[in-house]
Amino acid sequence: MMNPKRLSVPRLLTPVALAITLAACSSGPKTPTSVDITLEPTLSVQNYMINADSSEGSLQADWLIMAAKAALQNGDLAQADLLIKRLARMPLSEVQQAEWQLTRAAYHLKLNQADNVIELLNFKAWWKLPNEQWKDYYTLRVEAYTALQQPFEANRQLVTLSQYVDESQQAEIAQQIWANFTGYSQYEITQLHPDASEEVLDGWLQLAIYMKTMSANVPQLKNTLEHWFAENTAHPAALYTPAEIQSILDLEIVQPVHTALLLPLSGKYAKQAQLIRDGFIFAMMNDKDRDPEATLKVIDTNLYQPHQLKQQLTDEQIDFIVGPLRKDVIEVLQGELSDDSGQVSIPSLALNIPDELQTGTGICYLTLSPEQEVAQAAKHLFANGYKYPLIFAPQGNLGQRVVSAFEAEWKKYSTNKVAVSYFGDKRQLQRDVNSVFGLQESQQRIAQMEGLMKLPMETQPRSRRDIDSVYIAARSSELTLIKPFIEVAVNPDAKPPKLFSNSMSNSGEKQYEDLTGIVYSDIPMLLEVNPALDSQMEQLWPDQSNFQKRLQALGMDAYKLMAELPQMKVVPNHAVNGQTGVLTIDDQCVVHREISWKEHGAL
């Protein structure tokens, strides 16, 4: 009888162990077989590289693209550059080529090489790509043209980009297109020319041209905009209308019919008030478009108490007030006419600026403010390249106000300290000038040295050299003395500072002393030629001084602003050419006047 074969235990376990080992190997982590390269990277560069090393062909290219995107995301530009160059040597599908171009463009943007983006980011029109890639394509081109300061080209890309974004982003794109167009000047925007096929872009451009070129005539602008929107109901601007345009469309242009002019026609300020009144009525009589039903009630504020004024305004059905002139009367009358919210019942243009302004009251403010004039001087000096100004002002309250206004405005543009000096009466002018230019200190130092050395020194006092401009707030009689004192105080071998002055120096009287070379500011009516206006005023008011003419000009501008203020409140930066300057308003409805400049002795 044969014994049955005995199975060897080691031989039995060997195949079992092998099977277990193979099973263990097959259950380890696997490299993914696909990846969406249009998504943002979620893994590290190292992880993407591991996947790329364990893949080949098209899948390997996908992993390398994601690795390059991850490197850019982490700010590792050197690694991103290596991967971009490696991908350039590989065969890529259309989608891969697109994503590689996008990654390369993003890399150049991070290096501030926007011109390279425009050159290298160039999808083919026949490529069949997902919308996400086209969206990224136009987004990057927008960023590149914006960096190159080419807003019109950026708008071209934005218009096309709008085809690939959802509705929630359409309003943002429309806002960006409009913002780009508003950055152009009136001249620049008329030089832009879309292609014939760019109807959407052309529509945006046309609206921008209307807003830039017709802003001086808001009623005409409103009518033009209404016609455009009626004919272009499907344009993005009709769906996402810019707030600036909407404010014009919503504007109800109502001109005052019954106006009250409130002035202190008796008492201390009677002469000033009468000149303002004359200018106001002069402008009204020259207004060919004036409503034949319009009325004007001139009221002497010194003859009535505030509550009486209020009653008279009500009885006369006044719908617009010009004045008062005095600050205290403005404040009291504002209280009489205000409701619980502080809003006045009758819109007004006050002819002075109270010390404390309240916003949203319905009152605007126009005045010939010396502070406004001197603040513009600070801006003018800085704009013309002067860095170290000296302001020379009279002692007293006016001088302090002028200096404070100049310093406050100068600080907006420069950290350089303004040199300040106050002058007293005419007998002390030379001493004041020598003091501010450092001659007295220089003389004292020379005297000290001579005392120490017991010998006379062959030298002369030296003036300070850190002043490149002098703004002088002075009357013409004072300026004729100050100018030669400054010329003498400056050393012959030093470059003399440029001299500027305010409107007080332009009295209109014949100058017997030489003021040649001093640049001064004043209202346009006194510096710009207007034969028709000059002839009219000379016939009505012969031998008027410049001081009187400025007050008459204030009255003229007050009349003009009655019609312009509604537009100025809704049209950003809307400017009006007035007799006292180019007029604009700020958030508190204070009228600012851009004055003119001229040089004494200039032809």
UniProtKB/Swiss-Prot annotation:
Keywords: Cell outer membrane, Cell shape, Lipoprotein, Membrane, Palmitate, Peptidoglycan synthesis, Signal. Residues 1-24 form the signal peptide. GO terms for biological process: peptidoglycan biosynthetic process; regulation of cell shape. One of its GO terms (molecular function) is enzyme regulator activity. Its main location: membrane. Regulator of peptidoglycan synthesis that is essential for the function of penicillin-binding protein 1A (PBP1a). It comes from the Bacteria. It is a lipid-anchor. A lipid is attached at residue 25 (N-palmitoyl cysteine). The gene is lpoA. Interacts with PBP1a. It comes from Vibrio vulnificus (strain YJ016). It is found in: Cell outer membrane. This is Penicillin-binding protein activator LpoA. Coiled coil: none annotated. One of its GO terms (cellular component) is periplasmic side of cell outer membrane. InterPro entries: LpoA, Peripla_BP_I, TPR-like_helical_dom_sf. Pfam families: LppC. A lipid is attached at residue 25 (S-diacylglycerol cysteine). Belongs to the LpoA family.
